[in-house]
């Protein structure tokens, strides 16, 4: 819940909302994990996928991206964090440095926990 997407420029200034390709050095995604009364306190993998306008997941193994299996199919993730879920509406923050300009168009962000989608957001690059 409370998903926000920021672009971060070369000086570290964060701006929420749509942006121009040359303005973004990095993408920052912040959100809170919802409370889940039936979930035990335990470690979980939280992944994000940044999906480009062509429908491809933005990933770079050298920058911490990777893959996982769902129903026998390989899926890619942009970034991952291992957390201890403690039912306290934890705030998580992911920062992804693409290393090149983002293509113009509409992007989608999928937030995944233990291979299930738990949230979505979007942003546009002009």
Indicate where each model-derived feature is located.
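Membrane-proximal structural modules of membrane-associated proteins and complexes
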Residues: 1-126
């Amino acid at each position: 819940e409370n998903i926000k997407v920021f672009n971060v420029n070369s000086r570290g200034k964060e701006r929420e909302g749509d942006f121009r390709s040359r303005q973004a050095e990095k993408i920052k995604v912040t959100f809170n994990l919802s409370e889940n009364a039936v979930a035990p306190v335990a470690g979980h993998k939280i992944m994000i996928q940044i999906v480009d306008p062509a429908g491809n997941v933005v990933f770079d193994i050298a920058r911490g991206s990777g893959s996982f299996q769902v129903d026998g199919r390989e899926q890619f993730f942009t970034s991952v964090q291992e957390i201890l879920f403690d039912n306290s509406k934890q705030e998580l923050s992911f920062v992804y440095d693409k290393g090149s300009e983002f293509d113009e168009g509409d992007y989608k962000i999928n937030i995944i926990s233990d291979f299930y989608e738990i949230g979505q957001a979007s942003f546009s690059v002009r």
